[in-house]
Curated annotation (Swiss-Prot):
GO terms for cellular component: cytoplasm; plasma membrane. It is found in: Cytoplasm; Cell inner membrane. Pfam families: DUF489. The keyword 4Fe-4S does not apply. This is High frequency lysogenization protein HflD homolog. PANTHER family: HIGH FREQUENCY LYSOGENIZATION PROTEIN HFLD (PTHR38100:SF1). Belongs to the HflD family. It comes from the Bacteria. It is a peripheral membrane protein. SUPFAM superfamilies: YcfC-like. The gene is hflD. Keywords: Cell inner membrane, Cell membrane, Cytoplasm, Membrane. InterPro entries: HflD, HflD-like_sf.
Amino acid sequence: MSDQLIDRTMAFAGILQAVAQVQHIARHGNSDRDSLAACLNTVLVTNPDTTSDVYADKVALNKGYQLIINQLGDAKDKDVEVTRYLVGILALERKLARGNAMSILSERINQIHRQLHHFEITDEQVIANFAGIYSDIISTLGPKIQISGNPEYLKQSQVQEKIRALLLSAMRSAVLWRQLGGKRRHLVFARKTIVDTAKKSLTL
């Protein structure tokens, strides 16, 4: 098992970790603070020495690994909603990679770094800034990702901002996955290898 495969699977788990949080918040209106923080922190690590540096909370990443096993493995009960979100994120990432928005994205992330001198990463104002980056830079690139869930929660501004912030986190992992050589065809032709890597990467 190559280091690049391990790293690429880690980044893919990062996408699904964030997507799982989006799904949970959309359905239940709340989020686990540690899981939310773990996702948001990945956005801030822009010059990592290793892929592992991006995902400091290895336990939180387990949800992503479990989803890889479920979505790409032999399980019959695959989550169609998770697949739809994943397809949407990967489509937007391709448009981001082709455009010139990266420098603007970098500056906006630097603003959040400065904000963290005064606030925690899960503070409402910080989450609103993450959400603003997604709205201003990412969601303008292509068709919006349609989120399913409880309408009562989805109309709440705080829920909307958390969802957008988490979609930004998913996008960060998608960018990293692509940088590590990730390609859509791997999800079809190398599924078993990816699933095996996810199983070995699970932190128990």
